[in-house]
UniProtKB/Swiss-Prot annotation:
Pathway info: Purine metabolism; 7-cyano-7-deazaguanine biosynthesis
Organism of provenance: Methylococcus capsulatus (strain ATCC 33009 / NCIMB 11132 / Bath)
Species classification: Bacteria, Pseudomonadati, Pseudomonadota, Gammaproteobacteria, Methylococcales
Gene: queC
Record protein name field: 7-cyano-7-deazaguanine synthase
Enzyme class: ligase
Cofactor: Zn(2+)
An example molecular function term from Gene Ontology annotations: zinc ion binding
Entry keywords, A to Z: ATP-binding, Ligase, Metal-binding, Nucleotide-binding, Queuosine biosynthesis, Zinc
Length: 223
């Protein structure tokens, strides 16, 4: 099996991405990040999911994006909104996917892997600029210009299997692949036990996705 690095947050989208990469026959090395986010529940979920979904290795990288703040997810002084916002919301973490993909790229070089999977989505999403197809294309170009592998003739590919799927379609896909979505944590403001707030944008999209998919939502909500 070809090796691949799969970014795994512990949420619904990244779990589905890992399951898809496994279905496609990749030997998956899962990578998660403790980046100073509000809660650690998603990292606990990521560890469980990596094992459940058959990753051959799971690495958690510690980076301090809370040192620069600028996001409701890394700065406790900024409240997580309980309603949709116009424009790019305060839950956007500056340069997060650029940083995450850079670490994934470095690990891929070490592993001899040319494939990186990330669960970004540009349909039912919060409007983050680093989830758009044009960002992924630009990063893939960077990856092939800025690495020893690229200079020596190899070619990295950034896989985004969810990019054009609705949340409902993502849930249907993952359910067909046997994912237990009760194990995932998507909420921006989950508590230590992984209970979801039920009102943030991520909870709203998740609830809407299960409803539109016609599948019972296993999420434990506080409200």
């Amino acid at each position: 099996m070809k090796p691949a690095v799969v970014l795994l947050s512990g949420g619904l989208d990244s779990a589905t991405t890992l399951a898809i990469a496994r279905r496609e026959g990749f030997a998956c090395h899962a990578m998660s990040f403790d980046y100073g986010q509000r809660h650690g529940a998603e990292l606990k979920a990521a560890r469980r999911l990596a094992q459940s979904l058959g990753a051959i290795e799971h690495k958690t990288v510690h980076i301090g994006l809370d040192a620069i703040g600028g996001s409701a997810l890394t700065d406790l002084r900024i409240a997580v909104p309980d309603h949709p916002q116009n424009g790019i919301p305060v839950t956007y973490v500056p340069a997060r996917n650029t940083v995450f993909l850079s670490f994934a790229l470095g690990w891929a070089e070490v592993l001899g892997a040319l494939d990186i999977f990330i669960g970004v989505n540009a349909v039912d999403y919060s409007g983050y600029p680093d989830c758009r197809p044009e960002f992924i294309r630009a990063f893939e170009q960077l990856a092939n210009l800025a690495t020893k592998v690229g200079v020596e003739g190899g070619r990295f590919r950034i896989h985004t299997p969810l990019i054009d799927l609705s949340k409902a379609d993502i849930i249907r896909t993952g359910t067909a692949l046997g994912i237990d979505y009760a194990m995932t944590v998507s909420c921006y403001a989950a508590d230590a036990e992984g209970l979801a707030c039920g009102v943030c944008d991520s909870c709203r999209l998740r609830r809407q996705g299960f409803e539109q998919a016609g599948i019972a939502d296993p999420t434990r909500y506080r409200s």
